[in-house]
Curated annotation (Swiss-Prot):
It catalyses: tyramine + (E)-feruloyl-CoA = N-[(E)-feruloyl]tyramine + CoA + H(+). It is an enzyme of class 2 (transferase). The record marks 157, 160, 162 as: Important for catalytic activity. Its main location: cytoplasm. One of its GO terms (molecular function) is tyramine N-feruloyltransferase activity. It comes from Nicotiana tabacum. It is found in: Cytoplasm. This is Tyramine N-feruloyltransferase 10/30. PROSITE patterns: GNAT.
Length: 226
């Protein structure tokens, strides 16, 4: 059951979910979701992307084979069932139904209404994303997948959807010959930490994440090439 009022969406009992590969028509939503995750981590001052630069990164300037370049999976929700008729040569959408433990109140529904459904449904909304790309390591003789981030809008957290989205990326890796799925886990976020452990991720506490960026990186620039 669902109701809409003043651009808000209320869903009770069941929500229908689709995971699909993002495309250029989704760029405005991806930009907003990327901003929201920076907001969640108090890093908005570091968010330098624009819709145009993201589009170039993810689509126009991404000549890599599927899933080797920057890739985004979107998780869409709807109060009515999806039909299993969407034909996508690159990636077959994953469909699932969730029984809700609590009512979903989405005050951003109109802002995140999907523009790229590939069908005639008018009640499809983007709830979250997974961002990943291929990486390489001397430990393996094949590429792995670097899982950069997983994010859900506030209305769709704690509903069990994270497992579907992460599991879809893991299935992509397993089915396409990638050696691993790896990424960074925030040790301060116990729920996130426990989530990845429960998904089968092995945490290596003896390693620390390092980054060379900004002025520290520019010190290495060759002035003669500027």
């Amino acid at each position: 059951m669902a109701t809409t009022n003043n651009k808000n969406l209320t869903i009770t009992e069941k929500v229908y979910v689709r995971v699909r590969l993002a495309n250029e028509a989704d760029i405005s939503h991806i930009y907003k979701l990327f901003y929201q995750i920076h907001e969640y981590h108090n890093y908005t001052h570091l968010y330098k992307a624009t819709e145009s630069s993201l589009c170039d990164l993810l689509f126009k300037a991404n000549p890599n084979p599927l899933f080797y370049g920057p890739s985004v999976l979107l998780l869409e929700v709807s109060p009515t069932p999806f039909e299993n008729t969407k034909k996508d040569e690159k990636f077959k959408p994953v469909l699932k139904t969730f029984d809700l433990r609590a009512t979903v109140e989405d005050k951003e529904a109109e802002e995140f209404k999907s523009k790229s459904c590939g069908d005639e449904k008018e009640d499809v909304f983007i709830a979250g994303y997974a961002f990943f790309y291929a990486n390489y390591s001397c430990f393996y003789d094949k590429a792995g997948i670097y899982f950069e981030s997983l994010y859900f809008r506030e209305s769709y957290r704690k509903l069990g959807m994270g497992g579907l989205l992460f599991g879809t990326v893991a299935s992509i890796a397993a089915n396409n010959g990638f050696a691993s799925v790896e990424g960074i886990v925030a040790v301060w976020n116990k729920k996130s930490y426990d989530f990845y452990v429960n998904m089968g991720v092995e945490i290596f506490d003896e390693f620390r994440y390092g980054k060379l960026v900004g002025d520290a990186l520019q010190k290495y620039a060759d002035k003669e090439k500027v």
